[in-house]
Amino acid sequence: TYSGLNTVLRNSNMPLLNLKHEITEMSLIELPDELKNFSITIMDGPFFSIMPFPSRKLNTFSHVRYTPHGSWIDKDEYHNGYEILKDYEKKSNFRYMINDAKRYIPLLEYAVYKDSIYEVKTVQVKNETDDGRPILFTKDYEIKNFSNIMGGKIDNIYEILDTIKETKEFLGVKKRHFWNIFS
C-alpha cells in the first residue's frame, strides 16, 4: 500500500519521501466475442492495455493518457491519498479511452462499459517522465532498523531480494544468513 507510505512517516514524525500519487481509473469492460480470449497491450505512443479481471468475469481497460485523473506530490506537505480518493468525484474516462483504442483495434467499438475501479497509484517523482519503477529502499531511515521498501512492478519482488542481499546487514542479520531464509 505505497500510497500510505508517507502516512506512516508523518505519523512517526519522520521526513516524507518524495513520492507522486495519482488517482487512477481501471475501466471494467465486456469485450466483444472476437476478443474475449485475448489480453492486449499496445506499448507505443498513447498505449492502452486490456487484461482479464476474473472475479467479475470482465476485463480491465487502462490507457496511459486517460487512466490518471489527477496527481499530487507530498514531499513537503502530506496529503492523505485515501481521503482524497474517498472525496473524489468519480467520473469515468472510458469514452476517451475507447475512442483512442479503437483506432488501433476497431472491434473495441463494441466493448461494453460496466464499471470502474479507482485507486491511488504511487511512484517515485524521479520516474514521473518515464515508465521506470525502480525499487525504493531506504535502510535505517532516520532510525536504526527502520526501512522503507517500495517496488512498482511485479518483478520487483525478485529485485528487492537482490537489493537487500547487497547490503552488509539488514535487520541485524548477516547478509549470507538473511539470504538463506529465502532459499
What does each model-identified segment do?
Residues 56-60, 144-146:
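A generic structural signal for beta-strand entry/edge sites
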Residues 56, 69-121:
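Flavin-binding catalytic cores
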Residues 99, 103-183:
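C-terminal catalytic lobe of FAD-dependent flavoproteins
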Residues 64-68:
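Short, solvent-exposed aromatic-acidic interface loops
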Residues 1-2, 20, 90-98, 157:
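A structural signal for well-ordered alpha-helical scaffolds and beta->alpha junctions
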